[in-house]
């Protein structure tokens, strides 16, 4: 129980972040991760820390909950080991690490933390060892033995060939003339070294990793009588150039150098700050079409967006990445910076050829691919390699490709590839015009669309916007993914081909032979004007077969009661436009009759009052029509006596329906119920 309470307290502290804790001063991310490691070792006794070691390497990490349970660092499996926490040691015959390390001077503490090579090089200088053993309050960021061994031979030779100048200066650059613990190491701060007051950069990341000039702290906060020792994984060197100066002197940045100058971003890259530049090399330009590169280089706004997409808002050293991390660029896009083994990745791709090139105002990683943001792309480039490639091919075949690669302000409504699983339509005049109505004559953003808004298309149609609780639709087609906003155009990914409206609801019903009996009934009850005027209706239209399927007694009863017929017709008309993509699981739609219809959708099959819909989303200028194969009954239907006047009128409307049916279906015999009804009404 005690362990659970402590874990809960730690979880709350991690959730609150470094800015606040439940009690006492805020803990740094490093301290929180160290505390997590202490809690994980309860069964091993006090002062034991759990450490994750990457299999096959000497790399060890104090880790947070996520990494603990995943048992991976940069995609590589780890094993858990248990070591004495910083400042403690084992006692022979005792479990855990009960004894505090005795304090020694800085020089001796170097040996305790495993930096004996630093001790050795300190011995070679005339002045440094006496300082480390004498009175004072210094901090040294001491390279590990492996860090010294990994230095290029020519660099190491230059240091040891002049120990009292080069080597001494290098060691002093790792030192600060005061005591500095990790709780003082703030992200982005600069510490002044003991070498000519040169500065080095500190970065303290939310995952608890602390770096000094991108060298990771391996063991931190080892106290000495005259200071503090931190063990780091690299030998650090002075940094004198800002990001812009490095771009100017590196041969591999010729194209980048010209682009920065043309965009005016050189001022930013010279300024104070802590940026990460993902710097494209000359080779990166070879991986995109020359036409695309020239277009962007010739467009100041697109060029600036492109470069801003390569600049992260904060400095990110490679050693701080142990898993995928979303980072924001100056373009306000997000890139996933991750790792795979020793390789740094961007959006899952290992495109970084050189990492952790330090500048006074940040860090540079060389990349061999351009990261082109959506805001610098044409419509066709936005769609390249996406789930709408079939639609893009159709636009090209229809001769509309110039609209997708030009500088018109447009919005493309592109159906998903899955829409064409049964085959794409042939390119004819009808398809060409239909595709033109999938291009809006304005560059839109879905977040600014509103219910009832009308949009003008290249094909001359006006399309309506419908906003529902869980969907945003344009006519019968709903947006299936976040829109992509390009340089001039925006791409909306749609869940089906769009059908522009043609005619009123009444026009739609009259134009479809399936609804001749319904049309006759509507005309008799004088509802034609309602369904012809401006409005917003959802009509569940019973087909002729639906009326014919009624029992003879039911049909007679319906025709013998004017009010009941009117109520039933109005019950089939909803008071708003509801396309199938806006239904969700269940929608209760108020009808013109007053009662509500229960409209539901499951696995793309629509039903109303649990009756299946035969065809959905027949669009009209004032509504939408659904074909249904049953006649819906209001929940409180009260039959009334039929009058003689109704009988004559009923005969007339069904004569009209019969004539219409004969004209359109001369070779098809009417259903027996329908025939008997017509015969009866002649007498």
Curated annotation (Swiss-Prot):
The modification S-cysteinyl cysteine is found at residue 65. One of its GO terms (molecular function) is cell adhesion molecule binding. Plays a role in cell adhesion. May play a role in cell-collagen interactions. Binds to type I, II, and IV collagens. It comes from Oryctolagus cuniculus. Residues 1-23 form the signal peptide. The gene is TGFBI. It is found in: Secreted; Secreted, Extracellular space, Extracellular matrix. Disulfide bonds join 49-85, 74-339, 84-97, 214-317, 473-478. The keyword Transmembrane does not apply. A motif (Cell attachment site) lies at residues 642-644. GO terms for cellular component: extracellular matrix; extracellular space. Keywords: Cell adhesion, Disulfide bond, Extracellular matrix, Gamma-carboxyglutamic acid, Phosphoprotein, Repeat, Secreted, Signal. Located primarily in the epithelium of normal adult cornea, in fetal stromal cells, and both endothelium- and stroma-derived cells in healing corneal wounds. Not expressed in normal adult endothelium and stroma. One of its GO terms (biological process) is extracellular matrix organization. Gamma-carboxylation is controversial. Gamma-carboxyglutamated; gamma-carboxyglutamate residues are formed by vitamin K dependent carboxylation; this may be required for calcium binding. According to a more recent report, does not contain vitamin K-dependent gamma-carboxyglutamate residues. The EMI domain contains 2 expected intradomain disulfide bridges (Cys-49-Cys85 and Cys-84-Cys-97) and one unusual interdomain disulfide bridge to the second FAS1 domain (Cys-74-Cys-339). This arrangement violates the predicted disulfide bridge pattern of an EMI domain. Residues 45-99 form the EMI domain. It comes from the Eukaryota. SUPFAM superfamilies: FAS1 domain (SSF82153). This is Transforming growth factor-beta-induced protein ig-h3. Residues 103-236, 240-371, 375-498, 502-632 form the FAS1 domain. The modification Phosphoserine is found at residue 37.
């Amino acid at each position: 129980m005690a362990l659970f309470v402590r874990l809960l307290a730690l979880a709350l502290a991690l959730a609150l972040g470094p800015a606040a804790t439940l009690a006492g001063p805020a803990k740094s991310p490093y301290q929180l991760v160290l505390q997590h490691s202490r809690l994980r070792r309860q069964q091993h006794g006090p002062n034991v820390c759990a450490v994750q070691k990457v299999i096959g390497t000497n790399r060890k990490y104090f880790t947070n909950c996520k990494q603990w349970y995943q048992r991976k660092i940069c995609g590589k499996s780890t094993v858990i080991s248990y070591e004495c926490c910083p400042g403690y040691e084992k006692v022979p015959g005792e479990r855990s690490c009960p004894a505090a390390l005795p304090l020694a001077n800085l020089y001796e503490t170097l040996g305790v933390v495993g930096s004996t090579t630093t001790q050795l090089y300190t011995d070679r200088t005339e002045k440094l060892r006496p300082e480390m053993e004498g009175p004072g309050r210094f901090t040294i960021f001491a390279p590990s033995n492996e860090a010294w061994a990994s230095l290029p031979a020519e660099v190491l030779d230059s240091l040891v060939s002049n120990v009292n100048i080069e080597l001494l200066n290098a060691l002093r650059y790792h030192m600060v003339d005061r005591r500095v613990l990790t709780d003082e190491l703030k992200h982005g701060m600069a510490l002044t070294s003991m070498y000519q007051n040169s500065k080095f950069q500190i970065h303290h990341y939310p995952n608890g990793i602390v770096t000094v000039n991108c060298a990771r702290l391996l063991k931190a906060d080892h106290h000495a009588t005259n200071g503090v020792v931190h063990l780091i994984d690299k030998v650090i060197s002075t940094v004198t150039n800002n990001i812009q100066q490095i771009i100017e002197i590196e041969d591999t940045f010729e194209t980048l150098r010209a682009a920065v100058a043309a965009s005016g971003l050189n001022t930013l890259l010279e300024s104070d700050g802590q940026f990460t530049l993902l710097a494209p090399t000359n080779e990166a330009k070879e991986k995109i079409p020359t036409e695309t590169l020239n277009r962007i280089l010739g467009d100041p706004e697109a060029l600036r967006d492109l470069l801003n997409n390569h600049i992260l808002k904060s400095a990110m050293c490679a050693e701080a990445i142990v898993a995928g991390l979303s980072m924001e660029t100056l373009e306000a896009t997000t890139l996933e910076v991750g790792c795979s083994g020793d390789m740094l990745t961007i959006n899952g791709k290992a495109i970084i050829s050189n990492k952790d090139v330090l500048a006074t105002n940040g860090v540079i990683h060389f990349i061999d691919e351009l990261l082109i943001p959506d805001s610098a792309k044409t419509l066709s480039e936005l769609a390249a390699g996406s789930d709408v490639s079939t639609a893009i091919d159709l636009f090209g075949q229809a001769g509309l490709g110039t609209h997708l690669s030009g500088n018109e302000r447009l919005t493309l409504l592109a159906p998903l590839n899955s829409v064409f699983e049964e085959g794409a339509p042939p390119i004819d005049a009808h398809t060409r015009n239909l595709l033109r109505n999938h291009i809006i004559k304005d560059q839109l953003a879905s977040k600014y669309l509103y219910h009832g808004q009308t949009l003008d298309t290249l094909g001359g149609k006006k399309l309506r916007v419908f906003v529902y609780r869980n969907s945003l639709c344009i006519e019968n087609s709903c947006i299936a993914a976040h829109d992509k906003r390009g340089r001039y155009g925006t791409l909306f990914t749609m869940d089906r081909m769009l059908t522009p409206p043609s005619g009123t609801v009444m026009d739609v019903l009259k134009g479809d032979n399936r609804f001749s009996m319904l049309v006759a009934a509507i005309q008799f009850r004088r509802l034609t004007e309602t369904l012809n005027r401006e409005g917003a209706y959802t009509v569940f239209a019973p087909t002729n077969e639906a009326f014919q399927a009624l029992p003879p007694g039911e049909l007679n009863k319906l025709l013998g009661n004017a009010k009941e017929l009117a109520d039933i017709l109005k019950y089939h008309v909803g008071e708003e436009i509801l396309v199938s993509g806006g239904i969700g699981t269940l929608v209760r739609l108020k009808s013109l009759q007053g009662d509500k219809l229960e409209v539901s959708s499951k696995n793309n099959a629509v039903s109303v009052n649990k009756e299946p819909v035969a065809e959905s989303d027949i669009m009209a200028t004032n509504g939408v029509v659904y074909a249904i194969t049953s006649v819906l009954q209001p929940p409180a239907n009260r039959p009334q006596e039929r009058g003689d006047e109704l009988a004559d009128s009923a005969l007339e409307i069904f004569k009209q329906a019969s004539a219409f049916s004969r004209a359109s279906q001369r070779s098809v015999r009417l259903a027996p119920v329908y025939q008997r009804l017509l015969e009866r009404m002649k007498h």
